[in-house]
């Protein structure tokens, strides 16, 4: 009887580890690793049958490097690290009404450009 309990315990531990790892994976895109290129993707929240709403999503260029000494001298608040980045933004868009009252931008073309909104 102890023989079967040992295998049952091992099976339950392995099953719980598998379910935990499966639950911790991101939703969808399980095969794609890293960040996808900047492109249009359908916004499932605002899209309705016959009236899809698209938004720009994906990654662009970013890097950080030590601030050169001569640049630090001209800064009001000297910083040791300087960063550069471009964001995936809409090159063109149209305004559309969704849910009967909300006006949103339906992106039609994307490109990598200056970041206007940063997450803090």
UniProtKB/Swiss-Prot annotation:
A UniProt-annotated Pfam family: Hormone_6
InterPro entries per record: Cystine-knot_cytokine, Glyco_hormone
Primary subcellular site in the record, as a coarse category: secreted
Signal peptide limits: 1-24
GO molecular function: follicle-stimulating hormone activity
Entry function: Shared alpha chain of the active heterodimeric glycoprotein hormones thyrotropin/thyroid stimulating hormone/TSH, lutropin/luteinizing hormone/LH and follitropin/follicle stimulating hormone/FSH. These hormones bind specific receptors on target cells that in turn activate downstream signaling pathways.
Protein's UniProt name: Glycoprotein hormones alpha chain
Species this chain originates from: Alexandromys montebelli (Japanese grass vole)
Organism taxonomic ancestry: Eukaryota, Metazoa, Chordata, Craniata, Vertebrata
